[in-house]
Amino acid sequence: MAYPFQLGLQDATSPIMEELLHFHDHTLMIVFLISSLVLYIISLMLTTKLTHTSTMDAQEVETVWTILPAIILILIALPSLRILYMMDEINNPSLTVKTMGHQWYWSYEYTDYEDLNFDSYMIPTQELKPGELRLLEVDNRVVLPMEMTVRMLISSEDVLHSWAVPSLGLKTDAIPGRLNQTTLMAMRPGLYYGQCSEICGSNHSFMPIVLEMVPLSYFETWSAVMV
């Protein structure tokens, strides 16, 4: 979850988010090494008079500064492509939930159940209970089973929206007339918050997302009550 004044990324709750965190650290280390090398060279240029002003040709140096960046780009591209393919892969989902974006709320439909659907609106600040988060709580949470693959079908009724939950590494555009899909799997129970991540009008900041990941037995009880 997120914490006040947090500087880093949220804790990973899904295998995809764990991979994204590892890739972030991998890329950041490469950027740090390159930046350190550049700063070292600049400091040498500023503190020494040993400059090669008469050098006209240096094929060895040109070869190094051509091949080395290519190798670095490959080291960044290969894990990135692997994660992209993992995010697009859908393996026998146990449950499908259709999500529709509206100005300015979300509606959800559990397609595996005959009549299980609801709208999800943000709870106004004056109606919050002690311990609830401002601008992030909703009147109807999306309850899903943990440790199971869930497919989300995402679209929009009016303008562009984006369905995003950072702890799960999810961000999928909701486009009118187009059905996008993504998968999620939470490794532990809890409440996971997100928000619309595409500017969609005056109340864009007031359409949060709340996922409640629970054990399968609790989900079956909840779905039986809702239906």
UniProtKB/Swiss-Prot annotation:
Belongs to the cytochrome c oxidase subunit 2 family. This is Cytochrome c oxidase subunit 2. Disulfide bonds: none annotated. Gene3D superfamilies: 1.10.287.90, Cupredoxins - blue copper proteins. It is found in: Mitochondrion inner membrane. InterPro entries: CcO_II, CcO_II-like_C, CcO_II_C, Copper_CuA, Cupredoxin, Cyt_c_oxidase_su2, Cyt_c_oxidase_su2_TM_dom, Cyt_c_oxidase_su2_TM_sf. Component of the cytochrome c oxidase (complex IV, CIV), a multisubunit enzyme composed of 14 subunits. The complex is composed of a catalytic core of 3 subunits MT-CO1, MT-CO2 and MT-CO3, encoded in the mitochondrial DNA, and 11 supernumerary subunits COX4I, COX5A, COX5B, COX6A, COX6B, COX6C, COX7A, COX7B, COX7C, COX8 and NDUFA4, which are encoded in the nuclear genome. The modification Phosphotyrosine is found at Y218. The keyword S-adenosyl-L-methionine does not apply. Mg(2+) binds at E198. The keyword Nucleotide-binding does not apply. GO terms for biological process: ATP synthesis coupled electron transport. It comes from the Eukaryota. Component of the cytochrome c oxidase, the last enzyme in the mitochondrial electron transport chain which drives oxidative phosphorylation. The respiratory chain contains 3 multisubunit complexes succinate dehydrogenase (complex II, CII), ubiquinol-cytochrome c oxidoreductase (cytochrome b-c1 complex, complex III, CIII) and cytochrome c oxidase (complex IV, CIV), that cooperate to transfer electrons derived from NADH and succinate to molecular oxygen, creating an electrochemical gradient over the inner membrane that drives transmembrane transport and the ATP synthase. Binds a dinuclear copper A center per subunit. GO terms for cellular component: mitochondrial inner membrane; respiratory chain complex IV. GO terms for molecular function: copper ion binding; cytochrome-c oxidase activity. Cu cation A2 binds at C196, E198, C200, H204. It comes from Lycalopex griseus. Its EC number is 7.1.1.9. The gene is MT-CO2. Residues 46-59 are mitochondrial matrix.
